[in-house]
Structures are given as C-alpha cells and as structure tokens.
Amino acid sequence: TNDLSKKGAAENAKPERDNEKKKPSPLDEALDWIESFVFAIFIVLLVFIFLFRTVVVDGSSMNPTLYDQQRLILTHFNYTPERGDIIVANSPQLNKTIIKRCIGVAGDTVVIDYNTNTVTVNGEKLDESYLGEAMLDKFSFDQEYKVSETSYEYHVPKNCIFALGDNRNDSRDSRDEGVGFINTKNVLGKAVLRFYPFDQFGKLS
C-alpha cells in the first residue's frame, strides 16, 4: 500500500514539474516582447513607405500657409488630385519639385481677374481665405490666356491640373509659361500634415 501511495504521489507531482518547465523565464518573455515590438515597427514602416512620403518646403511661394524649410507628410498611394489640395509635383520645366495648391482639374475653366482679385472655376468664385494679400498682375504671364486687360482664362486639358501658389505675388505656377499646366503623372502626392517644426505640427487644408 505504501508503494502504491508513493507511486500516486509521484505521478501527481510530475505534471507540476512539467508545468514548472513550461513556464517561460523573464528573459524569454522579454525577448518575445522585443520580437513583437520590432515586428510592429517593421509593419508601421512598411505601411508608411507605401502610403506616405516626406518633403521639405523650399521657398516662399506657399506663404502664409507653408513656410520655407517646414517638413510635410504627403500621401501618394492611389491619389488623384482634387480642387483645393496642396500638391507636390515634379516640374520638368523648372527641374525641381514644387508645392502648390490645385485650383482646377481636367475639363475645368479657370478665370483669374486681377482687378477684382478673384479666381473662378467653372463660373464659381473661390473662397480663398488662405491668401495673405491681393494678387498683382506684375509677372510676364503667358499672354495666350489673356482675355481682358486684367483677366486670364485657362481651360485645363486632359490629364492635367492648374495649380497656384498661395503667395500669388511670389510664385511660379501654372500662370507662368515656364510651368504651365501640370501633368498628373508628375504629381507626387497630396500634402496632408506639417510635422516640423514641432510647435507648428498640424493638419493641412
């Protein structure tokens, strides 16, 4: 009877020892946590690379919305420019990357009147509260589009957009024959967030 009791006690103790063996050590738990953390960071970076990119503002053509050397995040995955978007594009004519605001898309008629300081798209006046000052007709704009002493009319062609800088008096944009209409294949994405300087962090509109 004593032998049977000892055998039973030994069998009961065996699972306890097995459980003790299976319990991970603090080091194993730490390594598992680190592995999960690294994997999560990898996934986040992968998503960021495919969905977003960063760009640095160069110059004053988007003042007062954007300023020189600010850092922006733009989304580019499956992106189609829309009116009002702040877009980033390659300009083959200027041989540089430019940041402007999309005013018109393919098929739109854009009229800029410097006398009334207005921009209309398909006959509708834009609310441009983001402008810092009145527009001046002081540049050598492409005269092909001039329809009166103070106004210009642009018909946006297929696969193109018409874009302007928010700082209209210091911006080379679609009014300039050196830039013209921007082909959508040259649009890199839409600027959605300003992340630097940190005290100016915020969503763009």
Question: Across the structure, where does each feature detected by a protein language model lie?
Answer:
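Hydrophobic membrane-insertion alpha-helices, especially the h-region
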Residues: 35-52
